[in-house]
């Protein structure tokens, strides 16, 4: 590991040096940096692909699945809690709207802070603390039904969920082999609607009239038990090697993380060991660098340049000062990544992800809010309605799992097709001139597919050093829009009627469909952290 650290530090220490003149400094610096990045990334990808899907990946998968299952159940529990507090205190519509939104507000705040939090402490510690606090909040939910207490409790719970949503997912996502990354990442998202569906079904069969408080406490047992299991499993999680290498530039700790993962897998084979000195991997990385034009096709060219660079360091005080500034910049780089999202490479995708995430989130939760308004025409039983509504999110998740790795469609074309089809369904509904439950269901069905794949696609586009920030900010805009969606839809519903909501959906869906055409990079089957480099 010490050799690994020295290997890459040696490459980084020559970034500001050039013996031939000022005009070539930036070009050579960029080539050395790209060569270093491609080489290191190739080592990581070879190691992960050789590992396959191991016991450690299963631990990550089950932890993520249980968390999303719990989060889904908490959505239904929130509905029961609102009904119960309203029954006890006869709340106004303002108070109901406030409490309905407070959890989403906590979630939104935490998505803004999650990158800052992971700069201060390890991901593992952030996950453990958030799981433990959410466990306390779930337990305390049993004891009191006071409006203020319940609001604070739901805010804290939403705050923890916002952190866990990003970090648990990324720990799994960044460790997956390339071939199954999209399939597994999309499969995980299935467990949120499954949690909603399972608890809604349980409520339908088990809840008794006139015993709402007893029923509520009984239902809280399920997320409480599952959260206890998540807390135990989180103890065995390791830091993401990719985050350590690229996000924090801690190369020795990254290699140590690979070692601990192999120990957890009880794997003694050489193929899964992270070995910087593997000549085959080194040669493959060099071939990639030559193909990209990062380095010339000369075996000793880079070694000669390194010797010349190091000789210049000893004789040039300005170069030494430049290296010190570079080291200082690396230390503050972790706190200034927002600018990277708006760099030339990522600007288009950052803006598109924010627009697509916020608009589709607004529409999705608007449909979620509107469905209960049309469902009573079919069935008056609340939880049976919820069973039907939540079941609509399950089939499109299976479609997303199949389509995301399809050679003909891939990520970007599936997102495009999903938004275009959803827009067409909205136009048909407008043409018919009335709100039909079937079309609302189809709208929710078709929108779920691009929304889920967009989550995976954005994670693949961003490099590791800005992935947490990029994904959390997209989630922030999505959650903020979903927070205001019920208020806006309630106003539209009251003032203009049910059908008017579709007049709001159509233009937003048109923007999403048009915007998705500018997603030019296909990420299927491609290694992380080199997608943007290869498409420059």
Identify what each model region corresponds to.
Residues 2-21, 26-259, 291-296, 319-536:
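Transmembrane-helix signature of 12-pass secondary carriers
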């Amino acid at each position: 590991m010490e050799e690994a650290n020295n290997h890459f530090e040696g490459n980084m220490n020559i970034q500001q040096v050039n013996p031939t003149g000022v005009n070539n400094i930036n070009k050579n610096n960029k080539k050395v940096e790209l060569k270093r990045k491609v080489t290191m990334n190739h080592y990581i990808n070879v190691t992960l692909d050789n590992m396959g899907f191991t016991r450690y990946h299963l631990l990550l998968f089950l932890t993520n699945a249980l968390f999303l299952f719990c989060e889904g159940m908490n959505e239904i529990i929130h509905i029961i809690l609102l009904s119960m507090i309203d029954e006890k205190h006869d709340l106004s519509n303002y108070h109901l709207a406030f409490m309905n939104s407070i959890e989403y507000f906590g979630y939104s705040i935490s998505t803004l802070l999650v990158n800052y939090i992971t700069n201060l402490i390890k991901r593992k510690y952030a996950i453990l603390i958030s799981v433990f606090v959410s466990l306390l909040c779930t337990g305390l939910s049993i004891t009191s039904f006071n409006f203020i207490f319940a609001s604070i409790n739901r805010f804290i719970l939403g705050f923890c969920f916002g952190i866990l949503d990003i970090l648990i997912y990324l720990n799994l996502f960044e460790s997956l082999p390339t071939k199954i990354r999209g399939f597994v990442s999309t499969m995980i998202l299935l467990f949120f609607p499954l949690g909603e569906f399972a608890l809604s079904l349980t409520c339908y069969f088990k809840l008794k009239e006139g015993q709402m408080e007893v029923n509520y406490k009984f239902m809280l047992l399920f997320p409480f038990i599952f959260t206890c299991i998540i807390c135990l499993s989180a103890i065995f999680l390791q830091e993401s090697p990719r985050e350590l290498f690229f996000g924090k530039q801690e190369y020795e700790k990254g290699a140590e993380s690979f070692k601990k993962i192999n120990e957890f897998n009880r794997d003694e084979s050489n193929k899964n060991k992270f070995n910087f000195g593997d000549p085959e991997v080194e040669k493959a990385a060099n071939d990639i660098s030559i193909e990209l034009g990062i380095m010339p096709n000369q075996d000793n060219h880079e070694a000669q340049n390194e010797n010349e660079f190091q000789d210049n360091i000893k004789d040039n005080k300005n170069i030494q000062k430049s290296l010190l500034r570079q080291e200082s910049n690396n230390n503050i780089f972790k706190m200034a990544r927002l600018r990277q999202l708006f760099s030339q490479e990522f600007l288009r995708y950052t803006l598109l992800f924010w627009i697509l995430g916020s608009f589709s989130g607004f529409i999705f939760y608007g449909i979620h809010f509107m469905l209960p308004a049309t469902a009573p025409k079919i069935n008056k039983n609340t939880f049976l309605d919820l069973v039907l509504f939540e079941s609509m999110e399950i089939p499109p998740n299976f479609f997303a799992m199949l389509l995301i790795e399809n050679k003909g469609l891939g990520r970007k074309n599936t997102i495009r097709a999903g938004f275009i089809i959803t827009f067409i369904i909205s136009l048909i509904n407008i043409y018919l001139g009335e709100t039909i439950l079937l079309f609302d269901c189809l709208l929710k069905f078709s929108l779920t597919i691009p929304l889920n794949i967009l989550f995976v696609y954005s994670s693949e586009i961003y490099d590791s050093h800005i992935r947490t920030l990029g994904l959390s900010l997209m989630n922030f805009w999505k959650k903020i829009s979903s927070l205001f969606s019920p208020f806006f839809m309630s106003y539209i519903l009251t003032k203009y009627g049910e059908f008017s909501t579709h007049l709001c959906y159509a233009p937003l869906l048109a923007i999403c469909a048009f915007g998705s055409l500018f997603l030019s990079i296909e990420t299927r089957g491609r290694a992380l952290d080199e997608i943007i480099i290869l498409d420059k």
